[in-house]
Amino acid sequence: MIEKFPSKGTSVLVTKDMCDLNNHMNVVYYQHIFEDGCHNFYQEMGFSNDYFNDGFSSFTLESNIRYLKELVEGEKGTPYFRLIKINPKLIHYAGIIVDEAGNVSSFSEHVLAHVDMNVRKTSEMPDDLIASLNSMLEEHNSTGPIDFDLRLSIK
């Protein structure tokens, strides 16, 4: 499964304060792992500090998370990401959180909008960024189809 999500994020060790009354990691921390763990993936997509300093960013328009296997205190969760589809203004990507045994704990999908921060509106990505993302998408697609039904989509 991991091979179909080629961008590895930052691992997180589940601590007692992350657990709820059910003695497993509370759902809010799954989002936290996906959010904090995607920085390398965003860099790989071209959303570097320089790009942001040039006045461009991305806003999340929609997210969907599925909880498949609980993580408990002392376990480590590692996020992995891949592109699903792009168009001139939008990016659809997915992620998984995997435990140390290789079990998928959670699956997420996200739709991002490319934003011109000078006007704070969705804008088309520059041609070089689209070309880079298309190359990345081709590489990710070469790993095979993902094993989850997608709930989000872009045209």
Regions found by a protein language model. Give the residues of each.
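Residue-level signal for glycine
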Residues: G102-V104
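A structural microfeature
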Residues: S106-S108, E124
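Hydrophobic core residues within well-ordered beta-strands of beta-rich domains
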Residues: K8, F59-L61, G77, I91, ...
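Generic short beta-strand
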Residues: K16, G95-I96, L112
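Generic structural detector for well-ordered beta-strands
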Residues: S11-V14, R66, V111
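Hydrophobic beta-sheet segments that form the core/acyl-binding groove
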Residues: S63-E100
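Hot-dog-fold acyl-thioester-processing enzymes
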Residues: I2-L61, D116-K155
